[in-house]
């Protein structure tokens, strides 16, 4: 059996040994992105690598808003979010199916019965042998979780979900709260704007002036964040046909966009504490 975690920041698959599996060619995570160009649909990593170059042809809401209603976006005329989720899972299962059978699916704690029924139908249509669905928060518990009430925080593309777990006996979900609109996509946009502002202030070069440099900055963002975990500042270089522009970037401009999210999370924690932590 394998585990499949449906988080739109990057769908993951793990084997019985709990090691992550290659879910796309050369990738351990498949982000919930779709791009349609000239009638051709791309999903996952390939779509994300085009998302800033062709934003009007990009959809990254289909897992967050999983439904069968027709999309109003002209670029996706005749499509539904369920269709895009089907295409994404089809690509993932093509990678996993040759060597794996039986799948336990970890789903967002915000999914209600309509989303779960729709997801089950998609997986049945793809002949994915689903053994069952489980809460993201429960799936994330370590084998020896503390025997107390715990709070699990899950960052998605367009929301942050807080789930209360009672682990004093067999672990169960007591409830959850969603900080809507505060997810990784909003943070990425704020971080990119902060970096672009630094470039404009110091070099007069605007990475947002050209779609290719905007995409390059987006693609480089995970590396920059990893570097700033280890050091107080790092160099950011943006190449154009005429020149290469460089700045030294500190943590501070990237920490400021986190404050509204942290405030919203703390407010939800206060509410959950009143309801579940006595």
Stretches with model-predicted labels:
Residues 114-198, 251, 261-263, 267, ...:
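Small-residue (GG/TT-enriched) beta-loop-alpha framework at ligand/catalytic clefts
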Residues 1-30, 37, 143-174, 191, ...:
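Gly/Thr-rich phosphate-binding beta-strand-loop-beta motif of the actin/hexokinase/Hsp70
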Residues 84-99, 141-144, 255-278:
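Phosphate/ATP-binding catalytic cores across multiple sugar-kinase/actin-like superfamilies
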Residues 98-109, 208, 212, 271-278:
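Short glycine-rich phosphate-binding loop at a beta-alpha junction
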Residues 72-83, 245-263:
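Glycine-rich phosphate-binding "P-loop"
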Residues 10, 17-106, 228-232, 236, ...:
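Conserved phosphate-binding loops in N-terminal lobes of ATP-dependent enzymes
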Residues 65-72, 91-95, 125-126, 194-202, ...:
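Conserved, well-folded catalytic cores of nucleic-acid-processing
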Residues 166-251:
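Phosphate-binding glycine-rich/basic clefts of nucleotide- and phosphate-handling proteins
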